[in-house]
Amino acid sequence: MGKPPAPIDMHPAPAEGAEADLSEQQGLVNDGVRKFAFPKEHPLRYALTNELHARPFEMLTPPVQTSMYATVLGEGAGSGVFDHLKALCERYGVNPPHRDMNHFSADFGPFRLRFERHTEFASYTVLRHGPFDVPFEKPASDFLPREWLESMPGEILLAIHVAILPVEGPDPDPQLLSDLFVPESLVNSILSGNSAQVWTDLRIHGDGHNRILLKPYDLPPAKAGRVVQRLLEIAAYRNFALLGLPAAREVGPELTRIDSGLAKLTAETASLVESGPEGNVAGQSNQTGATHRESELLIQLMQLSAEIERLNSRHSYRFSASRAYFALIRSRLTELREERVEGYQTIQEFLDRRLAPAMRTCESVEDRMASMSRRATRAANLLRTRVDFKLERQNQGLLSSMDRRAKMQLRLQQTVEGLSVAAITYYAVGLVGYAAKALSEFGLPVYP
């Protein structure tokens, strides 16, 4: 028997010069980065993926001091915010962010700055690592240039200091807490499964800032950054959610006035409808007077609807924003996983007692505006239907009258035509008679 055939190599080595082509076919390029031959990609594919990582948490190693400022931005304030931030970057030799960036974080040497731009506000968070003697005595914001801080664009709605104590140090004693916070308003809770403890009183102190004191027990840098970020977001969103409360109080009396007028017009409209298609109002004895009153009622209902829509367009954004901020606050509180400390309220309990009623007021006013708008629309539609029905009946009567007149005109025309035929026949016979007499006088045998 001959030698067995050589085994076939199922994976032959590529020919020289074809190795690069094969690597590219397999999706390999330089530096181990894979390149795939996709069909046409969606233009937002990378932008949407990067959005999930656009605002990473800061890495915080206690002890750390943090200051945050949230400023309300007006229309067209974008360029001013960028120029203001760019001036600080140039002062410290830091590359400024792109004009359209909504998030920026950089090390400025004495401090680290985190900037975020939201829909209606911008936030500046200053971080400084290192030991400190007394919390809030020399906060992180003191390391910002004073003139830069004072020229910050927009209106300050939140200014807050956060002090993170050393892990190995003792817990703050009652005397220190009494010096730092208002005892009657002090809130205290354990966070994230006994990983930290937080104290705050949610008040503005003499330096114009709120205060949060955090004692870490088991907080790795990434987790510490998440906890501080959530506490700061709760503080900011709390104030922005409460912006809807003054609007709700302002619009309340106007809604009461409009509601009273709407109730009166609705009652009169119902009285009209119940009186039947030909019914009168307040003893009016003619249909013209009733129709005139219906037109007046319709105009007044349209005016009330316009007032309701004016209020709705002015305040609906604020109420919707408050509802969205409140939902974010509840989400952040859930993420903190607070546990009660005997004798103190948690942050969630405090906000449930104080913030939740304010949000219910905003929701009540918003629902009231929507309800009044629907009521005014229904009343106007009801009255408009009645007016349209009466107009339709009037049109039917007019058409019937026109039909009767047309029939009378037709009969008259037929009568006139019959008389005309008789008259023409009479005159024709007369003419024939005259002609016959004339012909007989000429001797023709014609006998009329």
Where do the model's predicted regions map?
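Conserved helix-loop functional segments at active or binding sites
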Residues: 264, 268-271, 328-331, 335, ...
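Membrane-associated alpha-helical segments
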Residues: 296-429
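Structural beta-strand/beta-sheet cores of well-ordered domains, especially the beta-sheet scaffolds
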Residues: 65-67, 120-122, 210, 360, ...
